[in-house]
């Protein structure tokens, strides 16, 4: 089982249709050419939800793939309506992590437990998405950055 995670800015500022095409192409390539079957998603912004819906849509053609929501905080009602896009939720051991750092820690967990990263990250040094991308680069992870 090979795993891919996603990291991206909360707001998509580029042409959404181009991002959708690149995202779907990247996911299909990982499934067909790299045997990726598991996808981790943080569920925290436009890009994460686009990834969730895309993986969910691709399950029709690839019923063996799975999608998992990796929580940075204990679940709230906000997630209840959106869980149908995921097979499971995962809450890594982060109870002692201050809330300010929970998303960073969650992103690191997803990267540490994945072989591939599909990113939508621009050069915004102070963003969590950029920090996740930098962390993945330091781990020599295979990265597909679909930002325009």
Predicted features, each with a name:
Residues 1-148:
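Acidic/glycine-enriched connector segments
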């Amino acid at each position: 089982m090979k795993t891919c995670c996603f990291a991206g800015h909360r707001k998509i500022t580029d042409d959404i249709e181009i991002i959708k095409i690149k995202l779907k192409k990247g996911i299909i390539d990982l499934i067909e050419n790299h045997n990726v079957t598991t996808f981790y998603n943080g569920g925290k912004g436009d890009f994460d939800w686009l990834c969730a819906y895309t993986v969910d849509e691709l399950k029709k053609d690839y019923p063996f793939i799975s999608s998992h929501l990796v929580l940075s905080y204990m679940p709230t009602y906000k997630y209840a309506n959106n869980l149908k896009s995921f097979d499971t939720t995962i809450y890594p051991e982060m109870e002692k992590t201050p809330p300010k750092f929970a998303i960073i820690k969650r992103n690191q967990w997803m990267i540490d437990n994945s072989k591939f990263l599909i990113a939508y990250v621009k050069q915004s040094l102070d963003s969590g998405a950029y920090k996740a991308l930098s962390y993945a680069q330091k781990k020599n992870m295979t990265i597909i950055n679909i930002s325009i």
